A protein has these predicted regions:
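Hydrophobic membrane-insertion alpha-helices, especially the h-region
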Residues: 1-14
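Catalytic glycan-binding domains that act on GlcNAc-containing polysaccharides
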Residues: 11-177
Length: 177
């Protein structure tokens, strides 16, 4: 019983440190640069990175999304072209493995989605499922542009993705106000 009480006391004394280990702010200097440049909340960027790659800069998904923010090569090329971001189109994969480039393009893309849609929820759905898919859902009345009915997102993966990022975003907000 004493061991349990000691464990509980230690947990409460160290919980912020433990939570910050689970929800780190790795690459903070880089995120800060692009958070300011593209006007995207820092804690939202960290929540996306955590969900997408868990801060593994070399992560590659089964769909070939690359790096910290799990960008598809075609999406990265499109975002770079539309926003005058220099990108070596002959070696996009290598470019996306660079943490600076990945965070810049991912944050720029997130900023574009946040401007396009009326809510974080819908922007995050588009980050995961794609703009065309989300626009189709809105046109068909499946979801609203204001994000008030995210439970109606028809793709289970995207529905869970949006909820996970929103949860992680709130945790980041509490840990790093």
């Amino acid at each position: 019983m004493i061991i349990f009480i000691v464990f509980v006391v230690l947990f409460f004394l160290c919980k912020d440190s433990l939570l910050k280990m689970m929800y780190p702010k790795m690459y903070k200097e880089i995120v800060s640069i692009y958070e300011e440049k593209y006007q995207v909340e820092e804690n939202l960027i960290f929540a996306v990175i955590k969900a997408e790659s868990n801060f593994d800069a070399k992560a590659v998904s089964n769909r070939n999304a690359i790096g910290l923010m799990q960008l598809m090569e075609e999406t990265a090329k499109d975002v770079a072209r539309k926003n005058n971001i220099e990108l070596n189109s002959d070696n996009v994969r290598q470019e996306l493995e660079d943490v600076y480039r990945n965070i810049e393009i991912g944050t720029c893309y997130l900023a574009t989605l946040l401007k396009r849609y009326d809510s974080k929820e819908v922007a995050l759905a588009a980050y995961n499922a794609g703009i065309g898919t989300v626009d189709g859902w809105i046109e068909k009345g499946i979801i609203k542009n204001d994000g008030s009915d995210i439970e109606n997102i028809p793709y289970k993966e995207t529905n869970n993705y949006v909820r996970k990022i929103l949860r992680d975003y709130k945790i980041y907000e509490v840990l790093y106000p």
